[in-house]
Amino acid sequence: ELCQPGAENAFKVRLSIRTALGDKAYAWDTNEEYLFKAMVAFSMRKVPNREATEISHVLLCNVTQRVSFWFVVTDPSKNHTLPAVEVQSAIRMNKNRINNAFFLNDQTLEFLKIPSTLAPPMDPSVPIWIIIFGVIFCIIIVAIALLILSGIWQRRRKNKEPSEVDDAEDKCENMITIENGIPSDPLDMKGGHINDAFMTEDERLTPL
Amino acid sequence: MEKARPLWANSLQFVFACISYAVGLGNVWRFPYLCQMYGGGSFLVPYIIMLIVEGMPLLYLELAVGQRMRQGSIGAWRTISPYLSGVGVASVVVSFFLSMYYNVINAWAFWYLFHSFQDPLPWSVCPLNGNHTGYDEECEKASSTQYFWYRKTLNISPSLQENGGVQWEPALCLLLAWLVVYLCILRGTESTGKVVYFTASLPYCVLIIYLIRGLTLHGATNGLMYMFTPKIEQLANPKAWINAATQIFFSLGLGFGSLIAFASYNEPSNNCQKHAIIVSLINSFTSIFASIVTFSIYGFKATFNYENCLKKVSLLLTNTFDLEDGFLTASNLEQVKGYLASAYPSKYSEMFPQIKNCSLESELDTAVQGTGLAFIVYTEAIKNMEVSQLWSVLYFFMLLMLGIGSMLGNTAAILTPLTDSKIISSHLPKEAISGLVCLVNCAIGMVFTMEAGNYWFDIFNDYAATLSLLLIVLVETIAVCYVYGLRRFESDLKAMTGRAVSWYWKVMWAGVSPLLIVSLFVFYLSDYILTGTLKYQAWDASQGQLVTKDYPAYALAVIGLLVASSTMCIPLAALGTFVQRRLKRGDADPVA
């Protein structure tokens, strides 16, 4: 008579075995009930001062075909039930073990009035989006810098080119070398040779 | 001393640039909505008629003007008549407003794109509450996708008055969006011409991939049937016609000066009539194509939600009446409901308010447009697909391409008149001019990354361009037909391209299109006046839904300023020219 719906310290449990396991669903019978009692007793034994809890101290009642039922945990004298707070914390601490025993999860094995602790989402120290952002940001910055620099370089060459003879061109190249602080004569020479053909064409088309 | 104007490398680049500009987010998130609102398949009738009588002629007109005058909007209209230079200025001002807020969409697309590389997708689950026993309250009341949009992305404030500060995450994304735009426009047509190959074609690749995926999704046919079932009675609805005309008008991007700018880089002999027809047809075709994709995904989403709803009801009944698990199915649900209602009337009536009414029809009826469609509804569909990360990345990549493609046109509309002006371009290189424009826009755009930024975004989106554009294009057509002279323009075109202009275009330019625009203008103006106080939708965190609020006085002032600052350019510039000429004549008279 300690175990009845709505009784003090009694908890309702709901299982959705078919939803969770589909064709592999097992039938809910007395053996499963025994396992359930064992799991509850196991959880209770971990609570301080309740190490003596036996399987027979867990009482089930009102088992429906849903499968749902009520349960209480009694003290060794079997005269009164253990306080709800203790049962609650015991179940919460071991919810994962209980779930695994029945191949169920928080949604398909519900202890009404005992909210299960949800797994916190993975929280990496550096958010993923900022990493991707950083990569793309750097690529864009480099591309812009390259385009601008090449634009400036092209313009310099073009400005110098019309001002006659090779002398002037040499001078220009010297200037570049000095400005960059890198002796890059061979590179410039090479560039000059290749681009010669395009220069006149560019000049005709691109305004400044 | 005239410098040679830079040209497109080939006419394909020009067509791609126009397509990339015209095909924008409106095709993806506005057209499907209009289809849904105005009779599904039957909306195509007004849409196609408006395309032929309004879209094509006006597009042709703008391209022809650009190609003939070979200048950006300001210069082109000044050449036609000095009194009209205000039209060009107004175009530039509107483009400036547009690019200011438009790039915020790209920033959001970047933000969602970056967050797509996670498992699970951050908008598929609600964050946990403080003690880890349930989910965040606001998220529970709304939905995980709404929560991610309003709280994580916008961190929206409860009203326009509470500004909040600039938030660094969206601000960074906006900065990135502007850098990307700057990279694309840095070298003028030279670089834009190459970028448009990607921005114009990649969205189609993604759309095709999505079409294949969409059609194979469970429930896609529900959405497609919904879209293609014509509701003929909507043809008698004048709003359907007005919306069709408006959609064509804005989706082609008329009046911004972008098309004039693009066409100004054409060879004068270019056959722009052909290009106008191609671009407008492709634009409309894309809208229809995108709707098919959208509706197949819509169907999937609606079916998914409908089945979820049924499952929830089944679970509720199973739990309350302790029915056997798995006994209730979608097919016997109604029957069992009836049985339970008669067997346990009191218990049933007690829980009856909790039973949701599941209906596929009403799921399909919820029409959403704009950012709500892209960032809330689409993400909701994506999160339920398999390999959702892949689809999410593809989708937001497509949005980015569409957005950046349109941005290229918007910035060209600002930059071409600036680089055309001798005073500016003689002092500053092209890179510096475009850099400055991007910088200024980005700095002002930071307003939209504040907590109240989305409300300002709505203000700009609703009021910055609508009326001004109608007025600008109206003045443009009148200017060409009656100021410059239709005959003269016709002979110019003939000399340029070597083809006579067909009577059809002339009738449309001189009569039908201006009348259409005037009627649209009158409709919108009276609509604004009749609605009385302007309202906006604010997010209420405690209810987890949108509530309607009145705009505060200063917001109304900003709206007024937005409209006035662009439209007033036209009369002011005309007045200025008039005064200038008077003064000149006054100076000249005594000497003579």
From Swiss-Prot, chain B:
Name the species this protein comes from: Homo sapiens (Human)
Extracellular topology ranges: 27-42, 101-165, 216-241, 298-389, 453-465, 526-554
Q: Which residues lie on this side of the membrane: Cytoplasmic?
A: 1-5, 64-79, 187-194, 263-276, 411-431, 487-504, 576-592
The record lists the catalysed reaction(s) as: L-proline(out) + chloride(out) + 2 Na(+)(out) = L-proline(in) + chloride(in) + 2 Na(+)(in); L-pipecolate(out) + chloride(out) + 2 Na(+)(out) = L-pipecolate(in) + chloride(in) + 2 Na(+)(in); sarcosine(out) + chloride(out) + 2 Na(+)(out) = sarcosine(in) + chloride(in) + 2 Na(+)(in); N-methyl-L-proline(out) + chloride(out) + 2 Na(+)(out) = N-methyl-L-proline(in) + chloride(in) + 2 Na(+)(in)
A Pfam family found in this protein is SNF
Cellular component, GO annotation: apical plasma membrane; plasma membrane
Q: Does the keyword Translocase apply?
A: no
Query: Where primarily located?
Result: membrane
Q: What does this protein do?
A: Mediates the Na(+)- and Cl(-)-dependent uptake of imino acids such as L-proline, N-methyl-L-proline and pipecolate as well as N-methylated amino acids. Also transports glycine, regulates proline and glycine homeostasis in the brain playing a role in the modulation of NMDAR currents.
Q: What is this protein called?
A: Sodium- and chloride-dependent transporter XTRP3
